[in-house]
């Protein structure tokens, strides 16, 4: 990504913190967004650069797009997904079960829908339907 953009990445919590005060982003995409990351977002924990970037960005009342990839979306992570879906400025890339036979609680985002999700989120809309057919 650094080669494509010509910009240095953000690799520390301290480097992520100015995202908010400086208004550096229009939108933030977290892809993939694991169950652990969603749990920490829901709990307000900022112990990684990604989580600090999200917290700092949300100070500006701007959208955060989550692209879920978790083996327990229909288990322990479900409460966090529900909480985040009901929280202002969080938008989800539509997702579905990736292997309902071997991993019945697992769901992953339809990543090909990230661009459409970004467009919708920038207009304050959640791309629908959020839960889609299995892969």
Question: Model-found features: residue ranges?
Answer:
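A cross-family phosphate/adenosyl-ligand binding-site feature
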Residues: 1-64, 71-135
């Amino acid at each position: 990504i650094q080669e494509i953009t010509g910009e240095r990445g953000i690799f520390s919590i301290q480097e992520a913190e100015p995202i908010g005060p400086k208004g550096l982003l229009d939108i933030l995409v977290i892809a993939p967004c694991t169950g652990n990351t969603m749990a920490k977002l829901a709990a307000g924990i900022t112990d990684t650069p990604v989580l600090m970037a999200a917290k700092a960005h949300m100070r500006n009342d701007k959208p955060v797009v989550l692209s879920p990839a978790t083996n327990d979306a229909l288990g322990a992570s479900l409460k966090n997904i529900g909480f985040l879906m009901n929280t202002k400025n969080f938008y989800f890339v539509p997702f579905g079960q990736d292997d309902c036979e071997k991993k019945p609680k697992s769901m992953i985002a339809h990543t090909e829908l990230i661009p459409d999700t970004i467009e919708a989120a920038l207009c304050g809309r959640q791309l629908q339907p959020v839960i889609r057919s299995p892969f």
